[in-house]
A protein has these predicted regions:
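Hydrophobic membrane-anchoring helix/hairpin
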Residues: 1-110
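Solvent-exposed, non-transmembrane alpha-helical starts
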Residues: 86-91, 127-128, 159-161
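Short, charged, low-complexity patches
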Residues: 91-99, 103, 123, 127, ...
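A short, surface-exposed, charged and often Trp/Pro-enriched helix-loop connector in the C-terminal portion
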Residues: 97, 105-129, 138
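Signal for well-folded cores of large energy- and translation-related assemblies
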Residues: 107, 135-143, 169
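Short beta-strand elements
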Residues: 115-120, 140-152
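Long, charge-rich amphipathic alpha-helical coiled-coil "stalk/tentacle" segments
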Residues: 157-187
């Protein structure tokens, strides 16, 4: 409850009385709603597409890996409000704050990872590390936000080099196969 724009009290569920506008106003954030922030892409629900598709946002999704490759990552961050007072009064733009923290955290984790790990078996580890970093950033800001999940939607090489990347992968598989055949022949 705000009185003349200044925080006065937090009320509990049930019957509560407050002085009518313009003296007191009540802010009621949805603390049970799970919010979703998409990074690297915009879905139909975000941008008003009628085609049912998604639009890529390269300035958010292109990241440099630890082995100096570029990877295109789309991911979603799911979050809830854990402290309504902090959420309403400690940060001005909660969604912008979550987005900035998520981009920063993912770039930090990707910069420490190799491209092979990012594209194959390391996704769960990357998601967990990213979630921990986002939460620590939001806790530093006293935001009142709890990150519940980070979910990688897509992780691919950029479109311009995807064919060359697949050729390299096929060559590595052929090398492994030839090596295994040679070892089998030697035994």
């Amino acid at each position: 409850v705000l009185r003349f724009g200044k925080f006065v009290k937090t009320t509990q569920p049930g019957l509560n009385y407050h002085i009518p506008l313009p003296i007191e106003t009540v802010k009621t954030p949805k603390v049970t709603k799970v919010n979703r922030m998409d990074i690297g892409f915009r879905s139909e629900r975000d941008s008003g597409f009628s085609s049912g598709g998604v639009a890529d946002v390269p300035e958010e999704s292109l990241m440099l890996t630890g082995d100096e490759n570029i990877v295109n990552i789309d991911f979603s961050v799911f979050w809830v409000i854990k402290d309504a007072g902090k959420f309403l009064f400690q940060i001005q733009d909660p969604e912008g704050t979550v987005k900035a923290a998520a981009e920063t955290a993912m770039r930090e984790v990707i910069a420490k990872s190799r491209i092979q790990q990012i594209l194959t078996e390391g996704r769960a580890k990357i998601e967990n590390e990213t979630q921990e970093i986002i939460q620590s950033i939001l806790d530093e800001y006293n935001s009142g936000i709890q990150v519940t999940q980070v979910q990688t939607q897509k992780s691919d090489p950029p479109d311009q080099v995807i064919d060359a990347f697949r050729d390299v992968q096929a060559a590595r598989a052929d090398m492994e196969r030839s090596k295994n055949e040679a070892e089998a022949y030697a035994n």
